[in-house]
Amino acid sequence: MATITDPRDIILAPVISEKSYGLIEDNVYTFVVHPDSNKTQIKIAIEKIFDVKVDSVNTANRQGKRKRTRTGFGKRKSTKRAIVKLAAGSKPIDLFGAPA
Protein backbone atom coordinates (compact mmCIF):
# COMPACT_ATOMS: atom_id res chain seq x y z
CA MET A 1 0.00 0.00 0.00
CA ALA A 2 1.44 3.35 -1.03
CA THR A 3 1.59 6.21 1.44
CA ILE A 4 -0.32 9.31 0.42
CA THR A 5 0.90 12.56 1.95
CA ASP A 6 -1.04 15.35 0.26
CA PRO A 7 -4.64 15.67 1.55
CA ARG A 8 -5.88 16.68 -1.90
CA ASP A 9 -4.65 13.36 -3.28
CA ILE A 10 -6.83 11.51 -0.76
CA ILE A 11 -10.09 13.44 -1.26
CA LEU A 12 -10.85 13.24 -4.99
CA ALA A 13 -14.35 14.74 -5.34
CA PRO A 14 -17.61 15.29 -3.47
CA VAL A 15 -20.51 13.00 -4.32
CA ILE A 16 -23.43 15.10 -5.54
CA SER A 17 -26.56 12.97 -5.49
CA GLU A 18 -30.06 13.24 -4.11
CA LYS A 19 -29.21 11.06 -1.14
CA SER A 20 -25.94 12.79 -0.26
CA TYR A 21 -27.53 16.22 -0.70
CA GLY A 22 -30.24 15.25 1.81
CA LEU A 23 -27.63 14.12 4.34
CA ILE A 24 -25.97 17.55 4.36
CA GLU A 25 -28.71 18.78 6.72
CA ASP A 26 -27.45 16.23 9.29
CA ASN A 27 -23.80 17.38 8.89
CA VAL A 28 -22.97 14.24 6.87
CA TYR A 29 -20.94 14.62 3.66
CA THR A 30 -19.96 12.04 1.04
CA PHE A 31 -16.68 12.09 -0.91
CA VAL A 32 -14.98 9.92 -3.51
CA VAL A 33 -11.59 9.05 -2.02
CA HIS A 34 -8.39 7.33 -3.13
CA PRO A 35 -8.85 3.54 -2.99
CA ASP A 36 -5.71 3.01 -0.86
CA SER A 37 -6.64 5.56 1.82
CA ASN A 38 -7.85 4.53 5.26
CA LYS A 39 -10.28 6.17 7.68
CA THR A 40 -7.58 7.96 9.67
CA GLN A 41 -6.04 9.49 6.55
CA ILE A 42 -9.49 10.57 5.32
CA LYS A 43 -10.30 12.22 8.66
CA ILE A 44 -7.01 14.16 8.73
CA ALA A 45 -7.41 15.23 5.08
CA ILE A 46 -10.98 16.53 5.60
CA GLU A 47 -9.92 18.46 8.71
CA LYS A 48 -6.96 20.05 6.88
CA ILE A 49 -8.75 20.93 3.63
CA PHE A 50 -12.04 22.27 5.02
CA ASP A 51 -10.91 23.37 8.53
CA VAL A 52 -13.67 21.41 10.31
CA LYS A 53 -13.82 18.84 13.12
CA VAL A 54 -14.73 15.31 11.98
CA ASP A 55 -16.77 13.08 14.29
CA SER A 56 -16.74 9.80 12.33
CA VAL A 57 -15.80 8.31 8.96
CA ASN A 58 -17.46 5.35 7.23
CA THR A 59 -16.11 3.93 3.98
CA ALA A 60 -17.66 1.88 1.20
CA ASN A 61 -15.89 0.13 -1.68
CA ARG A 62 -18.03 0.16 -4.82
CA GLN A 63 -17.29 -2.34 -7.55
CA GLY A 64 -17.20 -1.05 -11.11
CA LYS A 65 -20.14 -2.01 -13.28
CA ARG A 66 -19.74 -4.30 -16.27
CA LYS A 67 -20.77 -2.43 -19.41
CA ARG A 68 -21.26 -3.50 -23.00
CA THR A 69 -19.14 -1.91 -25.67
CA ARG A 70 -19.19 -2.27 -29.41
CA THR A 71 -16.54 -4.99 -29.31
CA GLY A 72 -17.67 -6.91 -26.22
CA PHE A 73 -17.65 -6.07 -22.54
CA GLY A 74 -15.75 -3.48 -20.57
CA LYS A 75 -15.72 -2.48 -16.92
CA ARG A 76 -16.00 0.85 -15.18
CA LYS A 77 -13.38 1.43 -12.53
CA SER A 78 -14.09 0.59 -8.92
CA THR A 79 -14.34 3.50 -6.48
CA LYS A 80 -14.18 4.10 -2.76
CA ARG A 81 -16.54 6.49 -1.00
CA ALA A 82 -16.23 8.05 2.43
CA ILE A 83 -19.26 9.15 4.43
CA VAL A 84 -18.00 11.81 6.84
CA LYS A 85 -19.98 13.06 9.85
CA LEU A 86 -18.89 16.41 11.25
CA ALA A 87 -18.83 17.27 14.96
CA ALA A 88 -21.80 19.11 16.45
CA GLY A 89 -20.21 22.58 16.68
CA SER A 90 -18.43 22.41 13.34
CA LYS A 91 -19.17 24.82 10.50
CA PRO A 92 -20.80 23.42 7.32
CA ILE A 93 -18.68 22.61 4.27
CA ASP A 94 -19.36 24.70 1.16
CA LEU A 95 -19.25 22.05 -1.58
CA PHE A 96 -20.23 24.31 -4.45
CA GLY A 97 -17.88 27.20 -3.66
CA ALA A 98 -20.06 29.85 -5.26
CA PRO A 99 -18.95 33.40 -4.46
CA ALA A 100 -21.57 35.44 -2.64
Curated annotation (Swiss-Prot):
Keyword Zinc-finger on entry: no
Record keywords: Ribonucleoprotein, Ribosomal protein, RNA-binding, rRNA-binding
Keyword Ribosomal protein applies: yes
InterPro entries: Nucleotide-bd_a/b_plait_sf, Ribosomal_uL23-like, Ribosomal_uL23/eL15/eS24_sf, Ribosomal_uL23_CS
GO molecular function, one term: rRNA binding
Annotated GO biological process: translation
Alphabetical list of PROSITE patterns matching this protein: RIBOSOMAL_L23
One Pfam assignment: Ribosomal_L23
GO CC annotations, alphabetized: ribonucleoprotein complex; ribosome
Entries under Gene3D superfamilies matching the protein: 3.30.70.330
Quaternary structure, from the entry: Part of the 50S ribosomal subunit. Contacts protein L29, and trigger factor when it is bound to the ribosome.
PANTHER family: 60S RIBOSOMAL PROTEIN L23A
Primary role: One of the early assembly proteins it binds 23S rRNA. One of the proteins that surrounds the polypeptide exit tunnel on the outside of the ribosome. Forms the main docking site for trigger factor binding to the ribosome.
Protein family per UniProt: Belongs to the universal ribosomal protein uL23 family.
Protein name as annotated: Large ribosomal subunit protein uL23
Lineage: Bacteria, Bacillati, Actinomycetota, Actinomycetes, Mycobacteriales
